[in-house]
Each structure stands twice: as C-alpha cells, then as structure tokens.
UniProtKB/Swiss-Prot annotation:
It comes from Bacillus pumilus (strain SAFR-032). The gene is fusA. It is found in: Cytoplasm. The lineage of its organism: Bacteria, Bacillati, Bacillota, Bacilli, Bacillales. Coiled coil: none annotated. This is Elongation factor G. NCBIfam families: EF-G, PRK12740.1-3, PRK12740.1-5, small_GTP. Belongs to the TRAFAC class translation factor GTPase superfamily. Classic translation factor GTPase family. EF-G/EF-2 subfamily. Keywords: Cytoplasm, Elongation factor, GTP-binding, Nucleotide-binding, Protein biosynthesis.
Amino acid sequence: MAREFSLDKTRNIGIMAHIDAGKTTTTERILYYTGRIHKIGETHEGASQMDWMEQEQERGITITSAATTAQWKGYRVNIIDTPGHVDFTVEVERSLRVLDGAVAVLDAQSGVEPQTETVWRQATTYGVPRIVFVNKMDKTGADFLYSVSTLRDRLQANAHAIQLPIGAEDQFEGIIDLVDNVAYFYEDDLGTRSDAQEIPAEYKDKAEELRNSLIEAVAELDEELMEKYLEGEEITIPELKAAIRKGTLNVEFYPVLVGSAFKNKGVQLVLDAVLDYLPAPTDVAAIKGILPDSNEEVVRESTDDAPFSALAFKVMTDPYVGKLTFFRVYSGTLASGSYVKNSSKNKRERVGRILQMHANSREEISTVYAGDIAAAVGLKDTSTGDTLCDEKDTVILESMEFPEPVIDVAIEPKSKADQDKMGIALAKLAEEDPTFRTQTNPETGQTIISGMGELHLDIIVDRMKREFKVEANVGAPQVAYRETFRSGAKVEGKFVRQSGGRGQFGHVWIEFEPNEEGAGFEFENAIVGGVVPREYIPAIQAGLEDSLENGVLAGFPLIDIKAKLFDGSYHDVDSNEMAFKIAASMALKNAVSKCNPVLLEPMMKVEVVIPEEYMGDIMGDITSRRGRVEGMEARGNAQVVRAMVPLSEMFGYATSLRSNTQGRGTFTMHMDHYEEVPKSISEEIIKKNKGE
C-alpha cells in the first residue's frame, strides 16, 4: 500500500484547553467537517465521539487522549484529544511529546484560565507551535479582544488576531478574515456560510487597525518584510501568510481565530489555519536519540527511507483486541506482522496488526509511514515512553518524564473473587498510566494506589468497577510524605553473627549528608586499600536503597541524601553480600539520632478563582489550612488568589470552596515542591504511623 498523503500534507495536532472551554465539541466539529462523523455528538448530552470511555461521557470531561485521523482539502490531519483537567496533565504532556503543533481553545468569556496556563507552559517546554481558537463566541459575556489580551498579559505570548467576530453573544453572525481581508456570514447554526464578502462598513476601521498591528507584529520577525513595511510598500496576502507561518513554526508568534464550535461557526477556518500555519513532520527539527551501545547522539530524519523509529505514547486495554499501543512514527516505515526492537527495554516485539483509530471505530492498515500516528496490537512488553525501532539499526529516543504521584489511597477488594481480579486490573491500569502506581504495604498487607489527585484516583477505582468488574472499598486519601536529613554525620553499621559453623560478618562506616532538593539519593564509594572488597560495594548500595524506601522516622521514603562509604572491615570466611547489605541498613538506622531527620510534605501550588465578594472568606480559609497567600490579581470580574498549601490540608477543598462561594468558585492545584512539616504536626504523624 503506497503512501496516501505526502509528508508535507500531514499534520499531527493536539487540541488543548481548560476544562469546559469547548475542546471536545471543537474536535467533534472538526471530525464532522472532515467527513468522519455522520451525526454530531453533543458533550452536553454525553454522546461525544472522542470521549469514548464511559466515565468521560458521564462526567463530560476528556480523560484519555484518543488519536483520530481525519482528512481536509487533500491533507491528513491526525488529532490527539488531550484532557483539560489538572489531574490528567500527564496525558497532556504525553500527547504534546508526539504532536507537531496544537490548537489552544479558549473560552471567549474568560480568556486564559489557570489550566490553560499549565498546558501552555508544557507546550512551551516541548517547543510546540500553536494557533489559538477563541471559542464560545455565542456565550453571554463573550469578548474576543479581551481574550486576545489575556494571552499577552497572562502568558506573555506574542498573540495577534487574524480574525475578527461580527457581532457577539446571540448576535454573533460572522467572521472577518484579516489576512484575506474579507468577511463570511453564517446563515444558520449548521455552519452554512456565505461566500467571501466585503467587510461591513461599521467594521472597516477596526479591521484595518487590527490588520495593521498584525502586519507590524509579523514584520518584526522577518527582516525583508520589515523593510517593505517601513518603506510603505503593500504586503501581499501570500507574503503575510508566509510570515505568519514562519513566526508560528518558530514558536515566536500565535495567530488567534474566533468562532463557536457549538453553533458550527468558524471551525472550517480553524482547519484551514491548521494547514496554513501548523507544521508538517518535516518542518519540525528531526528527532534526536542515542545509540544504546555507545550513548552517542544521533538524528533520525523524518523520511520513509530512514531506519524505522517510533515512540509509544499511550497504552490502552481495549475490550475487543486486548492491549493497544499508540505510537508515533518518527522515521522509516513499518508493516504489520513484522518484528521490531523495543530499545528502551532491549526486547524483541512482534507487531500483529496496525490500526488507524477513529475516536471509537478503527480501520486496519498494512503499513505506517514516517509522521503517522497509529495503534499496534500484539506488543507485549512495551509501555508508555518506550522507543520502538528497526532491529538492525537501534536507537533510543528521548523518553518522557512523568511527575511523581502525590496522593495515596488504601483499597480493599470486597470479596475473595475480587481479590484476584483486582491485582490484574491494577497492573493493567498502571501499565496505561505512568503517574498511577500500585504497591502493597509490607506491614499491613494493604494495597495502596497512588496518583496525581483525588479525581485521578476516583476515576481509576471507577474504571476497575466498570471495565474489570472489581468491587472495592476505598480508604481515606493519605499524603505521600517523605523524609530527609537536615545534618550530616559519620555512622557505623556492624552485623556479626557467630553461632558455630559459618557466621555472618559485615562492617561499614558511612558518612551521610543532606543532598540538594530534588537531587535524590547519591552513593559514593570512597574505600581505599580494599578494606571492603569491591564485590560487596553493590550490596552495600542496595542495602541502603532498600532501607531508604521505609525511611527512619515514620516509614516514609527517605529522599535527597548523600551517602559516602569510606571505611569498614570484612572477614575472609564469614563475609558475604547479605551481611554487608544488613550492615548498611543498620548504619542508616543508626543515623537517626545523629542526622536530624525531618518529615517533608508535598506543597501544592493552588490557584482559586472567585467572585470579589468571597475574597475575605477564601483568604481566611487558606490561612486556616496552613497556606501562604503568594499573590492575587483581578481577572475580568473575578479575583484570583495564588497560594502554597500543604496537600494534607487540601482534601475535600472542592466541597468547602463550593459551599463558601455558592458554587461560583473554582480552583486548580499541582504539586510544587516538598517542605518540612511543622514539629507539632510531624510528631502526630510519627506517632500515628508507629501505631502508638
């Protein structure tokens, strides 16, 4: 099967937004116009095409990024739908990693919202070019130019309108295209639009003013254009388009479009802008990887002739075909039935079938080419972030980084039958989502699940029930505390057991010191003269690493410390790896009295958006939760309070905020850093954990 669309006619895009900015509806409409859907599904009725998991349809939010293929004007557009809720930012990161460009959807009434900022930051980190679609222009209070100004004020983005709405709220009836200098009117809510017309007289001045500031903004990024502009020469439409494209691809400029996806206005123009301004796989820098043997950096060009390389960016369990692995092909081609190398795990994998996904239906294809996004059936060992490549020409592409979970919940199966099923279900869910972890507490035997927030874990439990038919009782959420040392000391660990016959002997001297925040555990071997033989060093390091997991104060993992092994002794007959492993863990226990261990708790960066009149109550509430208010600003007619609050104090905050603001307040939070727990509180936690 030959390539259907050339590389320069391929677009891999994501649609990113705040909750409720209308992202799923926008995606829906795109699929509708590109001929993939026959009846439009409304998110309000819970029947949207992209939101195909049952919980998404019930909650009306998008959780998993389904990858869909569509066609528009002879181009292939692969769309990755990304979730807008902060508990799912890993999904967003994971999809941004494999896209080439994105459409950021804003709500015309609120402009840039807290989650938009988070997602925007992530897109900037990955250098993703963006166009912006100001949606919901038909909504009461919609204000296009205000929304454009929020992009500049809150995100410091060089964003300029390339369209202007004709009318607003229920009078929104058309769109002026500032690039082509024409107007389109919509004749009904089904998106039937007039041919290009002249700009209405009452909009001429505004349109000209905005067009001039657009030309000025892109001319600043292009010297040739700047000269023409300064000399007062006419800048042609193709020149203007080329300059907007160049600025957008360099992530220096963001064109802003307008419309109402719900009322089918402006979506076709968004599709045109995707083709005009967002990159093809050949426009973005070729992906870099490293050779597994030599760690040498190599570049994989985005062509069909290059060796095959791809990144698995999502693993899902499908009710019909089992495990589905979504992957993005960066170079080369892959035929179904062939073998590939998973270079991240050094395993050989067979690709059974290759499917091209439409939100919830699929089409089997025989070959995928560079730049394509597809799903493979039959990969056994591949998980999110792994590289798949040619067996003869291996490479490891840079993987994705996932944040550590911050919240733990104990979970118990309701019956014996559920017990066995629960293990399988949790393993499959953890395979799909790298920010979800599951472990068994060795002392209590309880199963603990950890995730990014309460909603994240709610949905996991919900999926166990629905997809795996596992009934479980869920405990109260627990905070993932950590421990660390505040001072250093030299400590001895000695393990001797002589009881006739062969004994055990391990003896070490280790210097412990606090490490920088976030630097993790560092082990240094400073033994000279072989006082501890070389073969026992790994056992000493392993002994320390195992003991770190259970901490020294209250059983929480010990982080950010340095350990330097500088002395010790051994016995010719009695020493073995096990003895040194135990000696190392004894040294760590002995460090408790000398190294001033403290308890750390996750601090959340919280942003609360509330109407002015509730300001006093909310500030008081944050302070009562041991929070520090770090700033506030007016945003439209609302107030935004930014604060740092310990996660342990944020449980149930959603409910309390609702009751404090009559349901008008919203908040977002994400983990920022770890901070020492105040002494009185840490004593309580230690007591509770030691069961006193």
